[in-house]
Amino acid sequence: MKKVWLILPAFLGAITLFLLAVLLGKFSREEKIFQEQIPLNGLTYDEAFLKEAEKLPGIQSVTPVVPLAVHLSMEEYSMDAELFGVELTDLQYQAEQVSDTVLGRTPVLLIGKEALSALSDSNGHRISEKRLNQLLEGCQDLVLTASFQERPEQTFPCRVAAILKEPADRICFSIDQAKALAEQYGQSFSVKEILLTVKGETNFRKAKESVSAPHV
């Protein structure tokens, strides 16, 4: 009987600690800032949209994102890709490598470490992970050539500001540079997505559902 009485308090103590850890974990996630790039699905990014977004609990920012479809080339490799124009001061990212490239007229890209994995040579052979890593390690001197798919003969260079650990699958650059490129090459410049930043996991889930629900 003594053993039972000794085990019971220990068991209850373990349960209490477990529940406390769960509650603390939940609390910490409700204090965390969440961010995700979300398609507008038919919504129009305008003053009315922003006013409604401001009412969402925990909202930190709603940043416009403008995608530009391009063809990228690097050495003997090339691929179709999207460059996402966004206000870089609002973008949360983790950089693996950073160069000292200065923002100017030449587009300066933040490249996710997996965003160029679809690069292929003229025979259709996908670039190896080893070769891609070698190229990305020299991001300071890396130059990509880009063109809009409707005007393949009109190419322009892009420099690299950083290789990102997160977000790993996107190529981002300044929305001001995106606008300048669109105007220079006669491309559409429209907000198709947003960068949604919300405090708290529950608030973020609800805000994401509200914004990403299909609209007609």
Where on the chain are the PLM-derived regions?
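Basic-flanked hydrophobic alpha-helices used for secretion and membrane insertion
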Residues: 33, 49, 53-61, 69-76, ...
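Membrane-interface junction motifs in transport/secretion proteins
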Residues: 26-49
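Extended, charged/glycine-rich binding lobes that contact polyanionic ligands
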Residues: 64
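N-terminal Sec/SRP start-transfer signal
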Residues: 1-29
